[in-house]
Amino acid sequence: MQSAAAVGLLRPCGATTAAAPLQLRNPSPRGFGVGVGQPLLPPRGLRLSAVAPRAGISARRIGLVPASPEQEDERRRGARDVAVAATAAAAGEAGAEEGGGLAKTLQLGALFGLWYLFNIYFNIYNKQVLKVFPYPINITNVQFAVGTVIALFMWITGILKRPKISGAQLAAILPLAMVHTMGNLFTNMSLGKVAVSFTHTIKAMEPFFSVLLSALFLGEMPTPFVVLSLVPIVGGVALASLTEASFNWAGFWSAMASNVTFQSRNVLSKKLMVKKEESLDNITLFSIITVMSFFLLAPVTLLTEGVKVTPTVLQSAGLNLKQIYTRSLIAAFCFHAYQQVSYMILARVSPVTHSVGNCVKRVVVIVTSVLFFRTPVSPINSLGTGVALAGVFLYSQLKRLKPKPKTA
């Protein structure tokens, strides 16, 4: 093996000779040489490289060399195209969002329209049947029966997910079903005795009973503004009652009892706090309550009025069998449909918006029934109804204002 000194990595000790200075010789046919050694580079002919143009273009791109007018125009057109494309993309996204928002608005408007339409048809057909067939327990049970069939159909077909509830949950739902049954029964009893418009005017007092029962059983004390909003409600209902042409005490107290039972249902639902599974949303809970209400009211029907919806009973009373059955079934379908649509709306909007929509719905039902049945209405009666409904609207707005927490 050669030593490091042999290969020139180390100078031999004591060597004092200095290296000859490097100098570049004149080019020779053999190439460029350094010092006295062999030529460093072999001779090659000169040729153009393709790298040079790219280097020039790169230099122009970074501004080292000015670009030609054609290249500058091309660059501007490219930048303009990119800007146009970005603007179009942003506009497309905004348009998609706007289109999605418009679709949701139209869908919500359609649901409100169906809610009002089903309510109108229910009240009109229900009133027509109750006027000639004064058996409100039978009619109410028919409505629960139709609702039960609809609920079972939706569960069997998979439109609604089958509920998975325990015995404890059924026991908690039972009181809700009981007051739900009584509330609808009292409403039908009132509709059979007085005008539709008057029943719904009395039912405008629901906020009064809601505040009263919540304070008594839940300890929820209302704000002074909420209490003040109840004054026009009570005053308007009183004024409308004094001037109501169809007034009778049975219809009046039935509507009042309906208010108490429906608001008791709301208080019970808060107090019992029914634990919901994933498959137990509001629509499913309403369907379960409807089925339970049918089985609760069926024996009561047998023990009180008896089964009066048979063809024999209807024909003996001189009633048109086809008309009674058709209108009863339409009213029952609309009864179940408008409550389902109401829950669908509640899932999309805030409770305050829903309560305002409910107030408007009551106005629509009152006006429609007055026009359809040609109910005589005096100016004082109209004023009382209007004041009561205005109070309901004011209540719904003030209810959302939460009292500020007291600081120490």
UniProtKB/Swiss-Prot annotation:
GO terms for molecular function: phosphoenolpyruvate:phosphate antiporter activity; triose-phosphate:phosphate antiporter activity. Residues 124-241 form the EamA domain. Residues 1-66 form a transit peptide. The chain crosses the membrane at residues 105-125, 139-159, 165-185, 222-242, 245-262, 283-303, 375-395. Keywords: Chloroplast, Membrane, Plastid, Pyruvate, Sugar transport, Transit peptide, Transmembrane, Transmembrane helix, Transport. InterPro entries: Sugar_P_trans_dom, Tpt_PEP_transl, TPT_transporter. One of its GO terms (cellular component) is Golgi apparatus. It comes from the Eukaryota. It is found in: Plastid, Chloroplast membrane. Belongs to the TPT transporter family. PPT (TC 2.A.7.9) subfamily. This is Phosphoenolpyruvate/phosphate translocator 1, chloroplastic. It comes from Oryza sativa subsp. japonica.
